[in-house]
Amino acid sequence: MSYITKQDKVIAEAIEREFQRQNSNIELIASENFVSEAVMEAQGSVLTNKYAEGYPGRRYYGGCEFVDVTESIAIDRAKALFGAEHVNVQPHSGSQANMAVYLVALEMGDTVLGMNLRHGGHLTHGAPVNFSGKFYNFVEYGVDKDTERINYDEVRKLALEHKPKLIVAGASAYSRTIDFKKFKEIADEVNAKLMVDMAHIAGLVAAGLHPNPVEYADFVTTTTHKTLRGPRGGMILCKEEYKKDIDKTIFPGIQGGPLEHVIAAKAVAFGEALENNFKTYQQQVVKNAKVLAEALINEGFRIVSGGTDNHLVAVDVKGSIGLTGKEAEETLDSVGITCNKNTIPFDQEKPFVTSGIRLGTPAATTRGFDEKAFEEVAKIISLALKNSKDEEKLQQAKERVAKLTAEYPLYQ
């Protein structure tokens, strides 16, 4: 920070305050994590200076021999992690990875089957406000009203009725194991291609704790942060037959020069994910999520689908204690717990209000939180939300958060 402090005190102060916020708060946003110092060092390296349009060995600029090394390593490590035939590590984000697949697999106006955003899908899976919903004819599938799990019979029925050219599996707020084999069977039945967006569960897949979609899907997209614990970015994994189309769609199709400093950071993160302790970490992520869900149930909260198989827990706060998701998010933030309001299946509230909150265990698990710590987290959440107008109780919750975060300091 010494160079930033000398050059730009305002930015240096903002960065320092953000570090203090991360260190003193319990981070429960399911899509966030804490990268290693090695990942941060790679992302802040001299590679940020290098333009490298093209791909390793096929660049439009000179002087790319060393970024060729880092990008090639990122590709090879990603292939090893997921067993993919081809990998493109250049997408700047998960959304751009999804866009590239759509451009390869679809024509404007084609029909696509994707998960309803309110049921746990993602903006890029056909939301009307997103490019995906504007450019393509998305038909939405959802979860069963009683079980709050994906209804594969409904997916099949919709596929047979609408004959989509592409089926999209994957979610941003779905806490159960996704059956990619069933999705593949449905896609084959209607002669559709299958794309899986595994952004949220990529780390679990890499560790063998969730079925690997690469075996079944024509295209797999992901972010490289979240459970994978790398820098913010995207990635596409596909079968060899789609290699040329995917690569030319990313560059020169929708992107120019790749962010080679970010790609180097991806390579470092993938290397970390190939180590044995990464599986141990992911196992703890899932254990902690199950403990968090069970402890909240014991505190009287209704958990969407009754529990979790992965890293996230969706809580129906409106149905449990009468608070909206927005009110719950603000209350928890006031005591040092960061989460996000989230719609739940069949939610009647607006997206900026919601009936639920989404909680995730990856970031706090990276800090070292174990099952006992997450039992305490659940009790603090309950104390704060059930006493959202009681300053004395909120202060007690705040003090308990401070005690927990002091036990598990960040980057120390």
Curated annotation (Swiss-Prot):
Gene Ontology cellular component list: cytosol
Record pathway: One-carbon metabolism; tetrahydrofolate interconversion; Amino-acid biosynthesis; glycine biosynthesis; glycine from L-serine: step 1/1
Site residues (Plays an important role in substrate specificity), renumbered to this chain: H225
Name recorded for this polypeptide: Serine hydroxymethyltransferase
Family indicated by similarity: Belongs to the SHMT family.
Assembly behavior: Homodimer.
Gene3D superfamilies, per the entry: Aspartate Aminotransferase, domain 1 (3.90.1150.10), Type I PLP-dependent aspartate aminotransferase-like (Major domain) (3.40.640.10)
Gene name tied to this protein: glyA
Annotated function: Catalyzes the reversible interconversion of serine and glycine with tetrahydrofolate (THF) serving as the one-carbon carrier. This reaction serves as the major source of one-carbon groups required for the biosynthesis of purines, thymidylate, methionine, and other important biomolecules. Also exhibits THF-independent aldolase activity toward beta-hydroxyamino acids, producing glycine and aldehydes, via a retro-aldol mechanism.
